[in-house]
Amino acid sequence: MADPARARRLAKRIGAIVASAIEYEIKDPRLTMVTVTDTRVTNDLHDATVYYTVMGQTLSDEPDFAGAAAALDKAKGVLRTKVGAGTGVRFTPTLTFVLDTMADSARHMEELLDRTRAADAALAEVRQGAVHAGDADPYKESAAEEPAAYEDDERRPD
């Protein structure tokens, strides 16, 4: 088992090496819109998981997730060689690439919050003209309404 601080430093270094290699050294056009978001290394330093996102060419374009995954799988050996040369560790970790869904989750959360805000605004608009049903204090009883059966009874409320 390695020191957790060492594993974090190695993960950060691996992420930087992989991101740099994808941007400057690997000439696959499917990797032009790939961004490395996070890297995790196991405690034994033998396996590294690289999280990535894929953006579309424009805001309205759908990203090519399958193409990016295939390109990363194809370039896995070259990237591992670059990581081995750049880190200088005894055993170069195997690389696993995982699509990071954090951006999609955040976008979905924002949509849910927007819908909730709209529902709250509609409810506040309805509440503006609303009045309470019934009397101001429906549980208040007047002395004249008190039943006569209690006059001689010990159960009479005080």
From Swiss-Prot:
Compartments reported by the entry: Cytoplasm
Taxonomically, the superkingdom here is Bacteria
GO terms of biological process kind = maturation of SSU-rRNA
Major location, coarse class? cytoplasm
Compositionally skewed regions (Basic and acidic residues) per UniProt: 134-143
Q: Which GO terms describe its cellular component?
A: cytosol
Q: Which cysteines are joined by disulfide bonds?
A: none
The question of whether Cytoplasm is a record keyword is answered with yes
Keyword list, A-Z:
Cytoplasm, Ribosome biogenesis
* One Pfam family cited in the UniProt record for this chain: RBFA
Kindly list the GO molecular function terms attached to this UniProt entry: ribosomal small subunit binding
Q: Where do the record's region annotations for Disordered lie?
A: 127-158
Q: How does it assemble?
A: Monomer. Binds 30S ribosomal subunits, but not 50S ribosomal subunits or 70S ribosomes.
Family statement: Belongs to the RbfA family.
Sum up the protein's function in the record's words: One of several proteins that assist in the late maturation steps of the functional core of the 30S ribosomal subunit. Associates with free 30S ribosomal subunits (but not with 30S subunits that are part of 70S ribosomes or polysomes). Required for efficient processing of 16S rRNA. May interact with the 5'-terminal helix region of 16S rRNA.
* Record-given protein name: Ribosome-binding factor A
Q: From which source organism is this entry?
A: Mycobacteroides abscessus (strain ATCC 19977 / DSM 44196 / CCUG 20993 / CIP 104536 / JCM 13569 / NCTC 13031 / TMC 1543 / L948)
The protein's gene is named rbfA
